[in-house]
Amino acid sequence: MPIEKRRWIPTALLSSVERLVKIRSVSREKDWKIRISSSLRVSLKIMTSFKWRGSFSWSQRLATCGDRSIDGDFENVDDYSLYEGMKQIAKTGKVLAIHAENAAVTDRLGEIAKANGETTLAAYVDSRPVFTEVEAIQRAILFSKETGCPIHICHVACKEGVDAVVKAQEEGINVTCETCVHYLYFTKDELDAIGPVVKCSPPIREQAQKDALWQRVEDGKVAFVTSDHSPCTPDLKDTDNAFDAWGGISGVQNDVDVMFDEAMQKRGMALKDFAKLIAINPADRYNLTQKGRISIGKDADFVLIKPNAPYTLTADDLEYQNKISPYIGREIGAQVVQTILRGQTIYSQADGVTADFPGQFIK
C-alpha cells in the first residue's frame, strides 16, 4: 500500500493533493491513484472534491505494517470513525477498501512475544492468529450491512476470511475480497530461511492455508489477486528481529509473471479466468471504466507474456528504487516482455522502462 518515496500528503489542504497530482503526472510511467489515510473527515472532503471514481481506503489495524513506529505511516481507524465514514461513503456509492486485522489483539500479542525474547518470523506469524483477521473482516461486514457501504477486503491471508465474505455475499451484502500472490506462493515454514524481506501483514500462513486459498481462487470466490506492493528502504528490513522489520513486500513487478506461472502453467487455469483475476474484476469493482478489458473505446493497455520461459530473478532485474524482493533467487516460469499503456510501449525487455511517457491521474 505505501508509496515508495514516502511523499506523505498533508491532508489539511486540498491544494496539497492538487500539487501532488501535478508532480506525479510528469514523473510516472503508469496510470495511478491516490490513497489518503489521515483525518477521516478531511479525507472524505478531499475525495468528494475530486469526484473520486474508484474507492476509499482505511485500515482496521496498526499505525504501521509491523511493530516499528514510522512517522507519517498509515494510521489505524477506530470503530466509530469507521462506522461514521462508512455512512458517508454509502451516500457516494463508492467502495471502501479495508485492511482487516484486530489491532487490539495483535498489538498485545506482539508485545508479549517480544518481551519473551521471540525474534523469528514464525513467532511473528503466531502473534497474528487467523481469528484476528477473521474478526476484523466480520466486523467490517457487519458495519457494511448496517450502513449500506460497499466494501472490499484487501489481502486476505486465510480461508476463513474468504468464507466470511462469501457468506455475506449470499446474504446480499455488497462485499468482495482479494488475496495476494505471496499468500499463494510462500508458506510459513520457509519464512525464516528467506528473512524479513518476506514479512507482511496479515502474515503468510501455513501450507494448509495456502492450499485452501488456491481452492477458493480457482472456485471464483476471490475477486482478484494483487501484489499489495508495500516497498521500503533496505535498512527497514535489515534486522535480526522480525518484529522490528518493516511489514510489507515489494511485489508489483512480479505479480503477473509469478501468478501466470503458478495459476496457468502449473494449475491449468483458463486465460479468461486469469484475466478476470488481474484485470477485469479489479477494474469493475473500482469503476475504472477505461481499464480491465481489450475493447474498442477503452484504453489500449496490454501486457505481453512469454510462457514457458523460466528465468531466475536477480536484484538487477528489479525496476524498483529499492531493489529488494522475496522473489530474488526464485525461478519464475514466464516472462513479461512488453507493457503497453494506452497504445504506447512503456516497458520492453530490450529497452527497459521508458523515460518519456508519463502516466495519468485517474480520479
Please give the residue ranges for each predicted region.
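Histidine/acidic residue-rich metal-binding segments in metalloenzymes
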Residues: 63-225
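Divalent-metal coordination cores built from histidine and acidic residues
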Residues: 1-105, 109
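Alpha-helix termination/capping residues and helix-transition junctions
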Residues: 56-59, 148, 219, 333
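Short, glycine/acidic-enriched loop or turn micro-motifs at the edges of active sites
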Residues: 102, 158, 181, 231, ...
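Glycine/Thr-rich phosphate-binding loops of Rossmann-like dinucleotide-binding domains
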Residues: 106, 162, 185, 233-235, ...
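His/Asp/Glu-enriched, well-ordered alpha-helical/loop segment
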Residues: 119-150, 197, 218-219, 223-225, ...
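C-terminal cap of metal-dependent C-N hydrolases
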Residues: 241, 296-362
